[in-house]
A protein has these predicted regions:
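Short, well-ordered beta-strand segments in beta-rich or mixed alpha/beta enzyme
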Residues: 2-8, 39-67
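Residue-level signal for secondary-structure boundary sites
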Residues: 16, 59-61, 97
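Short, surface-exposed ligand-recognition loops at beta-strand->loop->(often short) alpha-helix junctions
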Residues: 10-19
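An amphipathic, aromatic/His-enriched active-site/gating alpha helix that lines ligand/cofactor pockets
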Residues: 27-36, 54-88
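Short amphipathic alpha-helical/adjacent loop interface patches that line ligand
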Residues: 22, 26
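Glycine-rich beta-strand-turn "strand-cap" elements at beta-sheet edges
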Residues: 2, 39-46, 75-102
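Compositionally biased, intrinsically disordered low-complexity segments
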Residues: 6, 13, 32, 97-98
Length: 102
């Protein structure tokens, strides 16, 4: 399993605009083969939001980024002024996972 993170530096005062954009998103990724989950993390002490997507494998993620659904989901990008810096994109392979035991 892999986790793809996209850290987005949101300009001060534009947090609501950023969050509303995700509330109204097209919800197309959920139907992609290999997709597991999406998480959007609000910062507590910084201005970087983090969008995490979990995938069965890198090939599934790459297929998403090359799909017509991806293009549709990203066609109404927010205005550049909503961001105060470049985004930081990373991909990680999960090598260990733990959850609370029932």
């Amino acid at each position: 399993m892999i986790v793809v993170s996209n850290r987005l530096q949101v300009a001060k005062g534009r947090e609501k605009d950023f969050e509303e954009r995700f509330e109204g998103r097209a919800r197309l990724v959920e139907n992609m083969p290999g997709f597991i989950r999406l998480e959007i993390l609000r910062p507590i002490k910084s201005d970087y939001y983090t969008v995490l997507t979990h995938w069965e494998d890198e090939a599934s993620f790459r297929a998403w980024t090359e799909s017509s659904e991806f293009k549709e989901a990203h066609r109404n990008r927010p205005a550049a002024e909503i961001f105060s810096g470049p985004n930081v994109f990373e991909m990680h392979e999960i090598i260990q996972h733990a959850e609370k035991k029932s």
